[in-house]
Curated annotation (Swiss-Prot):
Regulation: FtsK is required for recombination.
Function of the protein: Site-specific tyrosine recombinase, which acts by catalyzing the cutting and rejoining of the recombining DNA molecules. Essential to convert dimers of the bacterial chromosome into monomers to permit their segregation at cell division.
Any one GO CC term of the record: cytoplasm
Active-site residues annotated for this sequence: R210, K234, H306, R309, H332, Y341 (o-(3'-phospho-dna)-tyrosine intermediate)
Localization annotation: Cytoplasm
Gene3D superfamilies according to UniProt: 1.10.150.130, Intergrase catalytic core (1.10.443.10)
Domain called Core-binding (CB): residue spans: 16-121
One of the record's GO molecular function terms: tyrosine-based site-specific recombinase activity
Keywords: Cell cycle, Cell division, Chromosome partition, Cytoplasm, DNA integration, DNA recombination, DNA-binding
PANTHER family linked: PHAGE INTEGRASE-RELATED, TYROSINE RECOMBINASE XERC
Boundaries of every Tyr recombinase domain copy: 169-354
Protein name (record): Tyrosine recombinase XerS
Family: Belongs to the 'phage' integrase family. XerS subfamily.
Gene designation per UniProt: xerS
Length: 356
C-alpha cells in the first residue's frame, strides 16, 4: 500500500477512536512501530469497539465516546464472548458460506488488544505517575496456537526456499531470462526498475532482514565497503547486519543509476525509491511483496519476502551449524526461533545421503 494511502486510512480510523487509543497510537509511533503495524492494530480496535457497542457492554453513542472504565471493567467472560463472536460471525466481503474468521486472525486481534491493555495498565502514566488502571483482563485470556511440529513446518516451508545454487539462480533469472519473456511494453516497464528490484531481492537473500527493515533503510544505513547495513529492529532497536558478498554488484548497479533514474534531491534519503508522478518516494512494503511474488512465481514458486529471510537463515545454518550465529543475523534474542532451520537442513542432508 502506498504510504500516502496508508496514512489517509490511519487518519480515518483515528477519527473514530477514543482518546486513550489515540494516546496509545502516539506512544507506539515514538517506539517506533511501523505505520503498517499501527494501521492493522487500529483496524482490530475498530472491530472490537464496534462489538462493544453492538453487544450493549457500553451504551455510548459511538466508539470515540466509549469510556476508559469499559476496558477497566471488562470481564474474562466478556472477552470470551467477543472471541466467540469473531469465530462464529459470517465472513464479510467473501464469496463463501464459511462461518467465522481463522484462529490466526483471532490471535492477531487478541495480540492488538493485549498491546493496548499493557499500555493502559503498565506503560502509561497519569498525573500521579500511575497507570490508568491495573486490572489487565487480557492476561486471563488464552490463545490457541496452530498445532504443528517443527518437522511438519520444515516440510511445508522447504519447497518455498531458494537453497544452494537457486539463490544465485533466482537473481540470474530476473536479470537475464525474465526479460526475454516480456512484451515490448512490459520490457520497458521492467527496465525502469530492474536494478532496484535486483538490489532489493539480493539484499533480502544476502542479509535475511525483514521486509519492513529493508524498505525503511536510508542511504546512510548502507556501508558498501564493509557490506553492513544498519537497521531498526522490532521494538525500535538499532542493529548492524552483515550482508553476503554476492549482493554487492547488485547494490552497486542500483546506486549507480539511483539519482538519475529516480530524479533525487538531497532530501531523498531513502535507499530504495519509486517514482510516483515524477516524484521520488520511499518504496513501500506492498510494492516489494508484489515484486517478489511476480518474479518468484515465474522462476519456481510464488513466495513472500519472508521466505527469502528463511532462505538466508537456512543457508547460513547449513554453512555454520551455529544457531547462535543465525539468531544474531536475524535479530532474535533467543536461538529457539532458529530451531526450524535445523530441521530443514537435516532434510537436505537426508536427501544427500539417499542419493549416494
Amino acid at each position: 500500500m502506498k504510504r500516502e494511502i496508508l496514512l489517509e486510512r490511519i487518519d480515518k480510523l483515528k477519527q473514530l477512536m477514543p482518546w486513550y487509543v489515540l494516546e496509545y497510537y502516539q506512544s507506539k509511533l515514538a517506539v517506533p512501530y511501523s505505520f503498517t503495524t499501527l494501521y492493522e492494530y487500529l483496524k482490530e480496535y475498530d472491530r472490537f469497539f464496534s462489538w462493544v457497542l453492538e453487544s450493549g457492554i457500553s451504551n455510548a453513542d459511538k466508539i470515540s465516546d466509549i469510556p476508559l472504565s469499559v476496558l477497566e471493567n471488562m470481564s474474562k467472560k466478556d472477552m470470551e464472548s467477543f472471541i466467540l463472536y469473531x469465530r462464529e460471525r459470517p465472513l464479510l466481503n467473501a464469496n463463501t458460506t464459511k462461518q467465522g474468521v481463522s484462529q490466526t486472525t483471532i490471535n492477531r486481534t487478541l495480540s492488538a488488544l493485549s498491546s493496548l491493555y499493557k499500555y493502559l495498565t503498565e506503560e502509561v502514566e497519569n498525573d500521579q505517575g500511575e497507570p490508568y488502571f491495573y486490572r489487565n483482563v487480557m492476561k486471563k485470556v488464552s490463545t490457541k496456537k496452530k498445532k504443528e511440529t517443527l518437522a511438519a513446518r520444515a516440510e511445508n516451508i522447504k519447497q518455498k526456499l531458494f537453497l544452494g545454487d537457486e539463490t544465485e539462480g533466482f537473481l540470474t533469472y530476473i536479470d537475464q531470462e525474465h526479460p526475454q519473456q516480456l512484451s515490448n511494453r512490459a520490457l520497458s516497464s521492467f527496465n525502469k526498475n530492474k536494478e532496484r528490484d535486483l538490489a532489493i531481492i539480493a539484499l533480502l537473500l544476502a542479509s535475511g532482514v525483514r521486509l519492513s527493515e529493508a524498505v525503511n533503510l536510508d542511504l546512510r544505513d548502507l556501508n558498501l565497503k564493509m557490506m553492513v547495513i544498519d537497521v531498526t529492529r522490532k521494538g525500535g532497536k538499532r542493529d548492524s547486519v552483515n550482508v553476503a558478498a554476492f549482493a554487492k554488484p547488485y547494490l552497486e548497479n542500483y546506486l549507480a543509476i539511483r539519482n538519475q533514474r529516480y530524479k533525487t534531491e538531497k532530501t531523498d534519503t531513502a535507499l530504495f525509491l519509486t517514482l510516483y508522478r515524477g516524484v521520488p518516494n520511499r518504496i513501500d512494503a506492498s510494492s516489494v511483496e508484489k515484486m517478489v511474488a511476480k518474479y518468484s512465481e515465474d522462476f519456481k514458486v510464488r513466495v513472500t519476502p519472508h521466505k527469502l529471510r528463511h532462505t538466508l537463515a537456512t543457508r547460513l545454518y547449513d554453512a555454520t551449524k551455529s544457531q547462535v550465529l543465525v539468531s544474531h543475523q536475524l535479530g532474535h534474542a533467543s536461538t529457539q526461533v532458529t530451531d526450524l532451520y535445523t530441521h530443514i537442513v537435516n532434510d537436505e542432508q537426508k536427501n544427500a545421503l539417499d542419493s549416494l
